[in-house]
Structures are given as structure tokens and as C-alpha cells.
């Protein structure tokens, strides 16, 4: 799809938001949002434009493999990739034409639209249309 213009952010489930913040600050990231929300999320931004969303993990089994956002039990690890798009309607039409189901659509308070799909292995992909 030529409407994808780049990676918007990466989601990472962590055991401690404070520990993650301290580590990623050493790499040049700066906290820009949070922690906020019922399942606390903190957002850090690198001067290069790389954006990481850290989501607090509340499950103690570190060896488990479920990191998907829409399942009730969570574990550490990457949760999804977010691809930035520039034409929401064209993307929705292309997904429908390819019989790729949209699992969730979210409109953020700033007007951005998020469409969630899964790859054949069940990995979550967010298609992010900025406001």
C-alpha cells in the first residue's frame, strides 16, 4: 500500500515504567506523555523521531508469550507495530478488497484515527492516520 508513509511508533510492554524510562533516557529518549491511563502508558520520543509507547505489564510470568493488546492476560515484549497512513478511506477499501478484517477502530481525542489489523501469525498492526 503506497499510503503507508512510515512507522509511527512501537509499543513495548515492560515490567517497570520507571526502569524503562531510566534506560531509554540513557539512549537519548525523552518522556513526552504519561504515565497515563488505567493500564499505564508512557510515551518517549527520540530526537530522531523514533517514538516508543511503554505499557506497564501486570502479569508476573516473564516466560509467557502473549503480548497482544486485545487479550486479557499480558506479558512483557513488543505489542504491535504502528504504520502511519495518509489516506484512511483508500486503506479501508484496500483492506476490504484483500479480505483483511479490521479488528478495531479508535478515534483519539486529537482526531487521529487508528485501525487495527492482524497479520497471518496474529501479530497486531496499527494503521495510524494522524489528525
Each predicted region: which residue ranges?
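Short glycine-/small-residue motifs
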Residues: 124-127
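Vicinal oxygen chelate
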Residues: 1-7, 30-82, 92-118, 130-131
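Short, conserved charged micro-motifs
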Residues: 19, 88-92
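A short, basic/aromatic alpha-helical/loop segment that forms part
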Residues: 85
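Conserved active-site tyrosine of GNAT-family acetyltransferases
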Residues: 20-25, 95, 122
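Conserved beta-strand-loop-alpha-helix junction that forms the acyl-donor binding cleft
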Residues: 14-17
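Polyanion-binding surface elements
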Residues: 10
